[in-house]
Each structure stands twice: as structure tokens, then as C-alpha cells.
């Protein structure tokens, strides 16, 4: 397996800059997810690893070797696409063995390798079938097995689960993670789905579009826990997490901000500012007990009952706030006046101007 390194990489198409000043390393054997909204450059970055998108600036290395101008065939990579790219007139076994046949390997060798790859992804009983007789999840497993047969240094996944329904996506997420653990392979995985990013990656690269005014694409690179619990900036705070983080801008008075009747003492980096942006995850807001005068007053505007939990949208003097909590006890009614309290240990603070995290 091989590490992948980006050093100040830029990618442009004509006068349009799509990726700017990208520096990150995918360690040997690591599973890294590139996640972000449309236009953030995630698929372009993946294509640059494969040699399908030209690098305009900086260096990209695979296994320590500079690959900017290397032919795609020499890069020792395998790619799994959103579309399965299977030959419809061939059986699963023929689809899997096609590349080996083109390379001139012996029939017995091809049969043995195909059987091994099919067993790895649970397709041993489907080798005689054509793609039209398979489910979406099974077709994606064929594509994965075909990548396995290349024995690459790096696996690339370009939104491979986007065409699957929710049940198959959940199952395939687990299968790909199990495959990574069993192979110890270096993997780079592109998705717009933060659930996939949070549940699959050893590390996550959160990317933003340059067209939105960002100076560079990479907003944060870290473990799922780091990205969720310590977002580096307001973009990451808003992008990662469902429902989205509550964000309000508050004046600083005497080194503190007020959330209704609650006072939150700021660290020195925030206490000297005129105002700060406060972020609070919906699960870290709580409904105060009845007749309590603590916190912020709000009115229940909307209730989503998910069975095991509730998501409440509340109208407050600070604007709409969303609360997420396990369903227990009495559920407030629409229009009911309630009080919200926040957990001061779970507060996120951001500079209003730079939108960077305040520690």
C-alpha cells in the first residue's frame, strides 16, 4: 500500500481555479474521506490522484514518488465509481476477469483470482449471473471486487453509494469499512454525505467551494471526533452535524455573553472582542424544568417526532433555534412557551470577522 501526499496543490481549468493550496497526507493504510458541498473540488482532487485531472501547481506524490505528470496506468490505483461501469452482456465472473484476460493471465489463474475476490465481497453465489439480475448493492460489490483484483497501492472511491437506497447504503458502508480493515489498504473516498464521512473515515477532509469566496478548499482535516467536537471554523460547524449547529452572534459585555439569563464567561481571545458568534449543537440545548426562570424563553414552532427522539424548532429573541433530545416524559405542544438552557461546556465560539474558532 502507499501514502498519498498533496503539497500546495492547485488545479485550474482555463482561468477557473477549482482547487487551491491543498496540502494533506493520506497515510499508508489510512481511510480518508473528502466531504463537502457541490463545487468544493472533492471529485477533482480524486481524479488528480488517478491522473484524470491535471495538477496546475504544487506536487502530488504516491508512495513518495512525484506523480504530477505520470501516466494513469503507472499510478498503481484502482477506482470505484458512482456508476458501476459493468458490461451488461457478461456474467459477474466475466466482468471480474476481463482485466486479467486483457493482461494475458492464464485461465486457471484468472478463475482462482476471481473466486477469491468474489468471496471477499460475498459474491461467490452470483458469479454466473449478469448485472441485470443483481441488486444495486450487489452490482457495487462487483465493482469493488474488480478493484480488488488490481491489487493497487491506493483505492479511490467516487461517491460509490449515491445510487443505492438507504438500506443498501448502510449495509455497503459497513462492507467497505470491513474490507478496509481486512486489506489494510490506503483509501480515498469522496462523498457529499456527512453520515458516510463520519462513520467510515479514519480522517475527514472538509472542503469548501472557492466560488463561495474561500481562499482555499481545505477547511479542516482531522478525525470524525475532532471535526464534530472542535470545528475549526464556522463553515465546518455548519456543514457537519444534522440538524445543523445553532449559530447566533452576541455582544460581549464584561468578558461574557448572555444566553437569556445564562452568562457565559469567554476565554481571553474572545473576551477582548466587541461580539462573538456562539455555536451550540442541537443535542446540547435542553428544555428547562417548568416554572424555571433559567435560560432563554422560546415558543415551540415545529416538532419532529422520530420515535426515539424529538427535534424541536423554537422561536426566540435570538432567532429560530433547534433542539434535539431523547423522547422522555411530556412533549411540549405547538405554540407552548418554554425555556432553553445551554451546556456551557459544549459551547463553540467563533470570530465574527474571520469565522475561525476561538479557543
Regions from the PLM with identified roles:
Residues 32, 68, 87, 124, ...:
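Nucleotide phosphate-binding site architecture
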Residues 181, 186, 192-262:
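Internal alpha/beta loop-helix hairpins
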